[in-house]
């Protein structure tokens, strides 16, 4: 229906902006952003768009630049096109050209002033920890398997709530960031246990480079009582980046969604990624953690 060959259009054909709700399984990608020696989500998506609209160079802009191995359930992307494809037809047209690890949930027309990144008022991430004794093959690509002790999610929740508001979170920023500052507004936090799964969500106006994975490493240390709350708070409040060493693995992290002042997509355009495999409910319970060391 949409041939790959170039379509001759009138010179006056207007440029249109299209917004996409995109999911991807990030295991085999170097992240969202193009890299010279690796395959990125951006590269694959731009190549698929270019097949359908070859009249102009395509640049896909995302709400969040996820790292290598990180997944997305509700990444938001925009690009500009000048071809004849109606906005509502972009999703099926792209899905016919994309690998199974990238799916476009919905496509909508947007004004030229709307920007997937700059117009976003928040991003929300979820980190999933599998805290069961036995390994679970079907959870491996989506979670961090921590099975040494039963994690204390209560103390983890207390630590998370202390981050709410406008904060300087330099302690959770990896080296190599190009941000001018490390301030961000943490808008909402949530931690929930369902059997052996622990799901931690954090919503903020923006995220620092490597922030969520470094934070999750500290939270797990708290939950295992290898770290106490006083030390955790001192590290981030006093910007002791050198003491924040352990980063959680990428596969447990998922960009749930980006939010805007108005609803861009229909309710079905967002998908709350929730693992629904057998959680090993009959496994014997893990031992509780010992008391944290004082410092």
Swiss-Prot record:
UniProt cross-references to InterPro entries, sorted A to Z: PsdUridine_synth_cat_dom_sf, PsdUridine_synth_TruA, PsdUridine_synth_TruA_a/b_dom, PsdUridine_synth_TruA_C, TruA/RsuA/RluB/E/F_N
CDD domains reported in the protein's UniProt record: PseudoU_synth_EcTruA (cd02570)
Binding site for substrate: 125
Matching Gene3D superfamilies: Pseudouridine synthase I, catalytic domain, C-terminal subdomain, Pseudouridine synthase I, catalytic domain, N-terminal subdomain
Record-level Gene Ontology MF annotations: RNA binding; tRNA pseudouridine(38-40) synthase activity
Keywords assigned by UniProt, alphabetized: Isomerase, tRNA processing
Reactions this protein catalyses: uridine(38/39/40) in tRNA = pseudouridine(38/39/40) in tRNA
Entry keyword tRNA processing: yes
Catalytic residues in the record: 67
A biological process from GO: tRNA pseudouridine synthesis
EC top class, as a word: isomerase
EC number assigned by the record: 5.4.99.12
Claim: Disulfide bond is one of the keywords in the record: no
Family: Belongs to the tRNA pseudouridine synthase TruA family.
Subunit comment: Homodimer.
Known function: Formation of pseudouridine at positions 38, 39 and 40 in the anticodon stem and loop of transfer RNAs.
Protein name stated in the entry: tRNA pseudouridine synthase A
